[in-house]
């Protein structure tokens, strides 16, 4: 199982439950750690038996480096309503649209 955005609030919680209930399965959290605080979930993920892979959904090469999963949970996103308020919304579009397409 692969969860993109796996170190974020939603992604980490959705990833830990199956990892705990199926300890023999290969569960991976994939995240670029762009959002402040995401790194605080890494210890909890490791304790639950989740493998962490740092990568970016905007990069097809990062995704191609992974073994194709049986299950994909796509939680990567730029959720901030202020994203792009500075006049540059490229990160928002590249993550939320292109990133989801790449998955």
PLM feature segments, named:
Residues 1-103:
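N-terminal Rossmann-like NAD(P)+-binding domain of SDR-like oxidoreductases, especially those catalyzing
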